[in-house]
Amino acid sequence: MKPGKSITIMLIIVSTVFISRATVNRKEYQEPLNVFIANSSINALIRKETSEAQNYVITYTSEDQKIKTERKESQQGGDSTSIEKRGTPEPSIAKPITSNPELGAEIAYIRGVNDRFPSYKRGATKRWPIASITKLMTALIAEEYIPKETKIVFTEHSIETEGTAGSFVVGDVFLKEDVISAMLVTSSNDAAVALARNLGKEKFMQFMNEKATTLGLRNTTFADASGLSYLNQSTAEDLFIFMKYLHLIHPEILEITRLKEVKIKELETGTVHEISNINALVTRSDYVGGKTGYTDEARQNLLSLFRDRDSNYTIVIILGSANRFDETVRLYNWHENR
């Protein structure tokens, strides 16, 4: 065989192998990933195909286990909204950090909903009292276990709870949805306790902690529905998973949290309560929703979801802060401009 002919054959073989490998790699890259969650404890990338987001909940498992789904019985009815229709994009990799933001919070965490890793984290696995952020789980359990048209009665026990937000009195009767709105918008402790007592406090707490386990929130515990107890604790990594779950599966809860004000009607007297949101970020057009929290032990907490002009969603977590709103905005701006 002539030398020139031998070189030509070798080039053809090498080119064929290269094209074949490139084709395989391209197929692997383009394989759809409809939902992914990085479990806080094991950093496992979870894959799940679903077309009925409202009718299924996600069970998070380790990498060597198969993904499980469990059928959720809806108390509300109505059409479900598929995750696929919302168009979850391929996960992106966070850009390299150029400099750290100046923050005084005990715990700070920011991560794009579809990013594999946070762009900034401080104390991400440290357990911390989350205060009224607890009410997001209270709302979730109330939506899943209390029928939509249920009338919630405010008892003396409910009204005796610390705090007066919502201006409720003993004997008030409201529809469940209105009580949830008051709880999320003005952070009413009375409303949270009234919801829990509808099912019974022990059963309600059981449902809250079972839901945390189901979602893979391994470092999260709940002791009451209001968040007043120091034992309502979580981590930034767990809160990221929880907020992402609400965003994908229960966006209606976050929609309530960004309302500037709500009007709810007492059913016995017809009295209308006008309630304003205590979250300063609801005036921002890019704010999707979230929840404030404060106790003396926890200091100022804030869990937030933002959406930029390209419809990219970002979760920001600030715990143990002296100025939660300022530090949340500072961290989000740093993330967007780095």
Q: Predicted regions: what is each one?
A:
Residues 161-197, 273-289:
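Conserved catalytic neighborhood of penicillin-recognizing serine enzymes
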Residues 7-21:
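Hydrophobic membrane-insertion alpha-helices, especially the h-region
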Residues 114-124:
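Short, conserved catalytic-motif segment at the N-terminal edge
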